[in-house]
């Protein structure tokens, strides 16, 4: 799975980074739901008064999605023998 991150400055001048954002094609099943949640999460981070500089979208989605959907989106293959 391909993940991306975003960096921006909030209104109070603090530079924040949002990590672990999955990259999905527009025709994939979970694209709309993740896009919608990402917009809400970025609004929440932008208007936050927290002093945190790094936020994880994966941890946010772990709290918001059903577990089966979360595993379908963020599932990572386990490699045998560290190959």
Curated annotation (Swiss-Prot):
Pfam families: DUF2535 (PF10751). It comes from the Bacteria. This is Uncharacterized protein YpmP. It comes from Bacillus subtilis (strain 168).
